[in-house]
């Protein structure tokens, strides 16, 4: 994926609810370090039981499935977002999310 394009997509599609900064939660949890992390594990964020109990590790395949249709992949998630249908857009956003780490 194209991380630069993914950053722009993140800013237009995700940044209203998610921070890309370490330790900064918003309506949704911070997505800093999301790649490789287990769902429902950001300190200080009040997750839905569905997300806490899902125990999904956020990697290429799981992020694609979640971003395509969050409520189908994790029924009961608090994420009020219809999803991203275009595979290229998901690939680029995931490429950007991989850069959000120490």
Swiss-Prot record:
Keyword Isomerase carried by entry? no
Query: What does the PTM comment state?
Result: Binds 1 heme c group covalently per subunit.
Task: Name a Pfam family for this protein.
Answer: Cytochrom_C
Q: Which UniProt keywords apply?
A: Acetylation, Electron transport, Heme, Iron, Metal-binding, Methylation, Mitochondrion, Respiratory chain, Transport
Q: Which residues carry this modification: N6,N6,N6-trimethyllysine?
A: 85
- In this chain, where does the modification N-acetylglycine occur? 1
User: Where does the record place it?
Assistant: Mitochondrion intermembrane space
Q: Which InterPro entries does UniProt cross-reference here?
A: Cyt_c-like_dom, Cyt_c-like_dom_sf, Cyt_c_1A/1B
- Pull one GO CC term from this UniProt entry: mitochondrial intermembrane space
Segments for region (Disordered)? 1-25
Q: Does the keyword Mitochondrion apply?
A: yes
Name the residues that bind heme c.
17-18, 79
What is a single molecular function from GO for this protein? heme binding
Composition skew (Basic and acidic residues), residue ranges? 1-11
**This protein's superkingdom?**
Eukaryota
Q: What does this protein do?
A: Electron carrier protein. The oxidized form of the cytochrome c heme group can accept an electron from the heme group of the cytochrome c1 subunit of cytochrome reductase. Cytochrome c then transfers this electron to the cytochrome oxidase complex, the final protein carrier in the mitochondrial electron-transport chain.
What's this protein's family per the entry? Answer: Belongs to the cytochrome c family.
What is this protein's name? Cytochrome c
Organism, by scientific name, is: Euglena gracilis
């Amino acid at each position: 994926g194209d991380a630069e394009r993914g950053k722009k997509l993140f800013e237009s599609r995700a940044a209203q609810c998610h921070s890309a900064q370490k330790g900064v939660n918003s309506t949704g949890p911070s997505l800093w370090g999301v790649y490789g992390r287990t769902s429902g594990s950001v300190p200080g964020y009040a997750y839905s039981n569905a997300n806490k109990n899902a125990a999904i590790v956020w990697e290429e395949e799981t992020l694609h499935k979640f971003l395509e249709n969050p409520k189908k992949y994790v029924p009961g998630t608090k994420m009020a977002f219809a999803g991203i249908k275009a595979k290229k857009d998901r690939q680029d956003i995931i490429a950007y999310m991989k850069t959000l780490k120490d």
